[in-house]
Amino acid sequence: GVRLAPDGSWQAEFEYLLAQGKKWADNTRAARLPRHLVRQSMASTIMKTMEYPLAITCFTKSQCEALMKPILKVGLSGSGLMNNFPRVVVFGPHSRQGLAIKHMYTDEGVQHITRFQRFTQDKHDMTGELMVANLQEMKMYLGLNGAIFSHSYKTLGHLVERTYCQWTWEFMDTYGMRLDDNIQDFK
């Protein structure tokens, strides 16, 4: 499961995942596994634990990096690599000679965008209905028509409350992405 808070805070989930990462790091360090098994363990256990809640969480980039820190420290050194191995290589794809470890923040953003594309298209899906309602609320609050994700977050983002849609809008704007929606405009 995922630890949710009524106020929309993700602190309990953050603390839980941080504890899981530290526990994995301590257990892996104590186990003295062969290098190939450390890498395999990292990919098949703790990284799956970290990826599971990302579809709904709204962690900041610094929170994601704090969650990854104990895992990368033990995972890289246990795999025979330096702890301070360049992160561009660590998070880079195999096709570019990277290690293909997913950065949690990027993975979180991609999962949010994927869910928007998938769920807002189905008018009979409860998740989609909630996303549409949140988008409509943001549009009404800002007094905007058109696709909300096509507007500049840097200009307007400070005017809306922290929500799932707001986080996704911030992520997309940070990386220069735009997404059209089929949400009906107000008249």
How does the language model describe each region?
Residues 1-61, 79, 110-130:
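Basic, alpha-helical interaction scaffolds
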Residues 22, 47, 72, 101-105:
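Residue-level recognition of well-ordered secondary-structure positions
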Residues 27, 71-72, 76-85:
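Mixed-charge, polar/low-complexity N-terminal
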Residues 46, 64-76:
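Short amphipathic alpha-helical coiled-coil/interface segments
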Residues 67, 81-187:
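Extended C-terminal regions of large enzymes
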